[in-house]
Amino acid sequence: MRCLPVFIILLLLIPSAPSVDAQRKTKDDVPLASFHDNAKRTLKRLWNKRSCCPQEFLCCLYLVK
């Protein structure tokens, strides 16, 4: 029975989780998943060039212009 009051006090000391987000999103916030999707799409477009030589990565970059 001694443990019950200690347990209740510990429960009261634990902060509860906020029901809403603490920080509001701004227009500059971009989900990280969309950033990775854009990077993958760009790399895929660079590698899908017909005249791109796999041995030389730099030749792919010159064809993007």
UniProtKB/Swiss-Prot annotation:
Q: What broad class describes the main subcellular location of this protein? A: secreted
Which residues are removed as the propeptide when the protein matures?
Answer: 20-48
> Domain annotation text?
The cysteine framework is V (CC-CC).
Q: Which organism is it from?
A: Conus litteratus
Q: Which family does it belong to?
A: Belongs to the conotoxin T superfamily.
Return the protein name: Conotoxin Lt5.1
Summarize the PTM comment.
Contains 2 disulfide bonds that can be either 'C1-C3, C2-C4' or 'C1-C4, C2-C3', since these disulfide connectivities have been observed for conotoxins with cysteine framework V (for examples, see AC P0DQQ7 and AC P81755).
Tissue specificity field: Expressed by the venom duct.
Report whether Signal shows up as a keyword of the record. yes
Q: Which GO terms describe its cellular component?
A: extracellular region
Query: Is Signal one of the keywords?
Result: yes
Q: What GO terms are given for molecular function?
A: toxin activity
